Amino acid sequence: MVLMDSVVIGGGAWGTAIANLLAFNTQRVTIFCRNTTVIDSINKRHINTKYLPTFPLNKNISATSRMDVLKNAELIFVAVPSQSMRELLQKVKENIKESVQIILCNKGIERESLLLMSEVVHEELPKNDIFVLSGPNFAHEVLSKKPSFSNLAGRNKTSYDKIANALSTETFFTKYITDINGTQILGAFKNVIAIICGLLVRMDAGSNTLSALMSLALEEARSFITIKNGNPDTIMEFCGIGDLVLTCFSNKSRNFRYGYRLVDGYSENALVEGKSTLESLHELARIHNINCVLTNTLYTVTQFNSYGTSSFEQDIKRELNSAFMSLLGCAKNP
């Protein structure tokens, strides 16, 4: 066991799963969050009753809402919604040492600035080493000790080794890559494609259509990676095709479920990362004058006046059909 203190910011399912991994390898693990129910249940019962009520946690995990817990941390993992990232950092940054590695476990793009999460962190904590953890992982499977794989993207191999030693177990594996930007844009983009997959499954589009969508999505992903100066080869990593498949073909994915229920008038204000990410990616494509057909089509669908009405499904079908024809460069059969 490594003699170091680790802090996970965020007491949701993924943050809790990460804390439990760290607890196998590090001396003390603290979850920093605001929810008193989560804090009390972890400290008193060693369980997160709000998000993961059936999974007992390692007993060297504690939880607190006190910011000063960050002062002694050697590793800080951040697992909070992307749109609250900057506000959080501004509140806690005075408690974070410059020598601490920051590991981002969230996926998204800041809506106002169109910055990736690592870019937001760099603005607020310019001296800290930043890593991104991303891969095809559901929290409950990680906690169930099912073999799981992630990329850990960063630009300092020595720091990677330190983080990997703290995080890796017999069933959780990390692979080092240096493409921080590509890793993040793929993590954001796959949420948009998952919404489209949910729509298509709800409309009984079939396996042929869904498989073709994956090919088209990978091409569109290249465009966004280029915008953010990433490496297109990252598409073939766990954080790329691996995460895309997991998120797009499982009804456990919140974004897939959102797309599935969207046809029936599910609230467009639903708290899914794909919703805000969609708006950000649409704006990025517009600014850089790149025709990202899938992203733009889904954005158009969410703006329909027919939203929640009986004609909404037909409007969706028309837009998706038009998008596929456009991507294939062919005209609709008479």
Swiss-Prot record:
Record Gene3D superfamilies: N-(1-d-carboxylethyl)-l-norvaline Dehydrogenase, domain 2 (1.10.1040.10), NAD(P)-binding Rossmann-like Domain (3.40.50.720)
Example of a GO MF term: glycerol-3-phosphate dehydrogenase [NAD(P)+] activity
First-level EC class: oxidoreductase
List of residues binding NADPH: 14, 34, 107, 139, 254, 272-273
GO biological process assignments: carbohydrate metabolic process; glycerol-3-phosphate biosynthetic process; glycerol-3-phosphate catabolic process; glycerophospholipid metabolic process; phospholipid biosynthetic process
Enzyme Commission no: 1.1.1.94
GO cellular component, one term: cytosol
Pathway: Membrane lipid metabolism; glycerophospholipid metabolism
A Pfam family hit: NAD_Gly3P_dh_C
InterPro entries: 6-PGluconate_DH-like_C_sf, 6PGD_dom2, G3P_DH_NAD-dep, G3P_DH_NAD-dep_C, G3P_DH_NAD-dep_N, NAD(P)-bd_dom_sf
The keyword Kinase is assigned to this record: no
Active site: 190
Superkingdom classification of source: Bacteria
Protein name: Glycerol-3-phosphate dehydrogenase [NAD(P)+]
Species in which this protein is naturally found: Neorickettsia sennetsu (strain ATCC VR-367 / Miyayama) (Ehrlichia sennetsu)
